[in-house]
């Protein structure tokens, strides 16, 4: 609560200082006080702070780049985009929900999603959506800065959870376990809805990434990647040499008519 009050106050003070400095530089100190520019400075700073915080809160609610896309009409017409898509699922969530109860399980999920947000952002990922106990992460191919990002983000998330071991054990009596599937392909991105508008992603790559993630449990793996995604990442000079790739060959995914080559990735 204190931080919610202090941060806007500091922002207002900083903007007021900069704005006052500009006025004094242009008009002189005497004119600044004489013509009551102090009130204008504070009022302008307050308005600017409110607008900046409002934008930040809405962007946090909608997701990175989504608000900008809606404001500028980037996706007013659906467009094709090449993206890496990861479905990351919390393992054993049904048992955890029964053990913790609805409210505490919600807090458990929220803690987990908050903890993994930073490594996702650090690796250039966009959190597209939370679906129950699952998070969908995407990288635009042209903005996926490093070949490390769609692969090593999984292991950085694991490191974050390990470091929070004591916290999760003390509060919930269990540690989050998770599995992920990564795929690459063309999605269709466009605005969807009227009363509640969002930028929606659709296409075969979304369904396939979800099916790859489902294969993790069947194959006793924690991270499976399609060879389509691996081959695209291997084209880059900075492909991480530290990862261990174990091929599972071509497999039949549930609900898919054609087979797909997948591999497990480990460090």
Predicted regions, residues:
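Hydrophobic transmembrane alpha-helices
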Residues: 1-34
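Alpha-helix/helix-capping structural signal
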Residues: 91, 186-187, 228
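Alpha-helical scaffold within the catalytic cores of cyclic-nucleotide enzymes
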Residues: 110-124, 141-180, 184, 204-213, ...
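Catalytic NTP-binding/metal-coordinating core of nucleotidyl cyclase/transferase enzymes
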Residues: 77-152
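Regulatory cytosolic signal-relay segments
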Residues: 21-81
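Cytosolic regulatory/linker segments at or just downstream of nucleotide-handling modules
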Residues: 218-267
